Amino acid sequence: MRPVRIPRLPRFPRAAARTTTAARTVTAAAVVAVIAALTACSGPAPSNPALAKIPPAKVPPATYYLALGDSLAQGVQPNAAGVSVMTPDGYADQVYAALRPSRPGLKLVKLGCPGETTASMINGGICRYQGGSQLAAAVAFLQAHRGRVLLVTLDIGANDPEHCGGQPGLGQLAKCAVKDIPGAVDHLGTIMTRLKAAAGPGVRIVGMNYYLPALAEWRSGLPGRVVAWTAEKLAATYNAMLGRVYAKSGARVANVFGAFETADFTKPAGTNVPRNVARLCQWTWECAAPPRGPNQHANQAGYQVIARTFLQASGLS
């Protein structure tokens, strides 16, 4: 293989390498100009008085919506296997979704406990909380964020007389409910006193009364209709007592009992089902077929009704 000959580069005459003083001055000036131009491109933008007047964007301060209560405060619904589970579709989530667009810094804190009673909310024993109970955790949160809480909602008391539903007759049912109701009302008074003291003035607290799952008994013939009618009278009395406690503490009431038309046994034209029973079946899982039903928790549409009732009562909608 023949070697490749690399041509020799031409040699510039020595005279061409020399520069005059004037030439060097011009070259130096050009280099300085180039450096200055590069510095101008990579350096800070020139001052603009109009832009200087625009303040930096402010991050909105965090405010809070505190949701307290039982399983409804956690959006509990039955899953496909019929197991009651917490969901992100409860009334608290829907209230938060309605409030947040106009309040970018708003945060939702849910402390509700499925199965909670007024007594366990005070003393603990069902769900685990720092401080031992839901009420202690709520008080600690309100004290730590005083002046930054927009809204507190509460649903509690439905589970207190719930065990009375297992009584063998109407007489026993009524006696059981009458026995349990005064204690629940007293406990609610304690809860509200402590919440109001921790929250301070100006915080909106809205308590909820309840719809009545026992209305579903109406569908089981005459005996069931008597149970539904009797249960509605007891529920109306109980909800009125809860309402008086809320009003005495300065809280507002979300009238879910009324929103579900619980007291209305009239039958709309062309139907054989009372309006209150139809609403219960429409907005809860109580009338659903197994495995999801019967389940007393609200469905998504029912939680939407409850959320709307809370918003109207709060005055924030």
Language-model-detected regions and their locations in the chain:
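Alpha-helical cap/lid subdomain in secreted, periplasmic
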Residues: 132-293, 311, 315
